[in-house]
């Protein structure tokens, strides 16, 4: 995973090249980037991972570097995880992010219209273009 190219655009936010194969994305100051926790930011192959108390894995260096580069420019990063369904897990994950040099990041399981990018190890990526009523589905 290559380091992100990020250019400030003044008050508007940043121009971010999330991939060398894509055009840059304007990330406004109100936008945020979501990062899944298990299997994306933290390893999920640790002993007992799938059994209570569901221990947290070690950091994944490549994604940690990507998150640090986003945070260093001022872009908001939130941990997006199903673990947040149980509120007692939120401070545990925040402690982990703080211990691992990311600061105390917001942890959520809710999307909103300001989520501009999402990193996940299990999501299926699909891109849809606007279709006219004449297009076949």
Residue ranges and their predicted role:
Residues 2-137:
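HAD-like aspartate-dependent phosphatase fold
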